[in-house]
Amino acid sequence: MARGCLCCLKYMMFLFNLIFWLCGCGLLGVGIWLSVSQGNFATFSPSFPSLSAANLVIAIGTIVMVTGFLGCLGAIKENRCLLLSFFIVLLIILLAELILIILFFVYMDKVNENARKDLKEGLLLYNSENNVGLKNAWNIIQAEMHCCGVTDYTDWYPVLGENTVPDRCCMENSQGCGRNSTTPLWKTGCYEKVKMWFDDNKHVLGTVGMCILIMQILGMAFSMTLFQHIHRTGKKYDA
């Protein structure tokens, strides 16, 4: 009976972590594709030049893939050492997430202030040769979100010249429209637009966050339960 429960739990955890591992592989693949095809796409911050969309997705994908692999191997081998490692990794990730969320809300005003300042400094690199990714990112976000600059369109004046903005700031986009002072422009800054997007989608984001939290807790529960079952049935392991 105990052995049957152990087998059932083992394969449930293996399947759970196999899905986890496949998701990690998918994220890693997307990150590598972004890195190869888009270069430094979405590198907005001059203070953190490595914090691009590609690098972020690669890092998350790698963590998810390694964690899933630990869980799969620990379950199928019934190895208490690997199961404990899997539990500790998930616990560290969970604690790191909670600490980051708490710090974000405690220092929200400071985060907003520094983010705006850093993004404005990043605009100065818009036309530099080594920052094509930053230029692409700003062009896309301004066109898609109907915004201009960080706080408003005047953020571009010190970068491109008086009364000059990127063409994607124009309500009716056309070649050279950003140099025409009479062209209607998007007035709202992109920072405010992004904040509005997060506010409009907070329920969806909250649901996604809750699902991730539940998956992490389930993974920890599966690993500890399997760990205890192996211990009770006297299963030995290789350290």
UniProtKB/Swiss-Prot annotation:
Extracellular topological domain residue ranges: 35-55, 107-203
Recorded topology in the membrane: Multi-pass membrane protein
UniProt subcellular location: Membrane
Transmembrane helix is among the record's keywords: yes
Top-level taxon of the source organism: Eukaryota
Residue ranges of the TM segments: 14-34, 56-76, 86-106, 204-224
Keyword annotations: Glycoprotein, Membrane, Transmembrane, Transmembrane helix
Cytoplasmic membrane side: 1-13, 77-85, 225-239
A cellular component term, taken from the record's GO annotations: plasma membrane
Keyword field contains Nucleotide-binding: no
Glycosylation, residue list: 180
Modifications the protein undergoes after translation, according to the UniProt entry: Glycosylated.
Family statement drawn from the similarity comment of this UniProt entry: Belongs to the tetraspanin (TM4SF) family.
PANTHER family the UniProt entry points to: TETRASPANIN, TETRASPANIN-9
Assembly and interaction partners: Found in a complex with GP6.
UniProt protein name: Tetraspanin-9
Provenance organism: Sus scrofa
